[in-house]
UniProtKB/Swiss-Prot annotation:
It holds the Pfam family Ribosomal_S18. Part of the 30S ribosomal subunit. Forms a tight heterodimer with protein bS6. GO terms for cellular component: cytosolic small ribosomal subunit. It comes from the Bacteria. It comes from Methylobacterium radiotolerans (strain ATCC 27329 / DSM 1819 / JCM 2831 / NBRC 15690 / NCIMB 10815 / 0-1). This is Small ribosomal subunit protein bS18. Binds as a heterodimer with protein bS6 to the central domain of the 16S rRNA, where it helps stabilize the platform of the 30S subunit.
């Protein structure tokens, strides 16, 4: 079966807007393992660290963020797994 031009088969190219890192800038928040409210925004509902391609955090700040989350987990401020 042949599809005509009116079938809507053409796709527009996906335009991805580059987001800026929320931790870089003049009044950006500091990454601190004691700031549970900030860290919980970068942990999924299952307790996993959200990747930087979703959160738009730079590579350097993503490493700092992961270290802070792991520190908070070790001290019992954040859970390892959320059921």
């Amino acid at each position: 079966m042949a599809f005509g031009a009116g079938a809507g088969g053409g796709r527009r190219p996906f335009f991805r807007r580059r987001k800026t890192c929320p931790f870089s800038g003049a009044n950006a928040p500091k990454i601190d393992y004691k700031d549970v409210k900030l860290l919980s925004r970068y942990v999924s509902e299952r307790g996993k660290i959200v990747p930087s391609r979703i959160t738009a955090v730079s590579a350097k700040k993503q490493r700092e963020l992961a270290q802070a989350i792991k520190r908070a987990r070790f001290l019992g401020l954040l859970p390892y797994v959320i059921k």
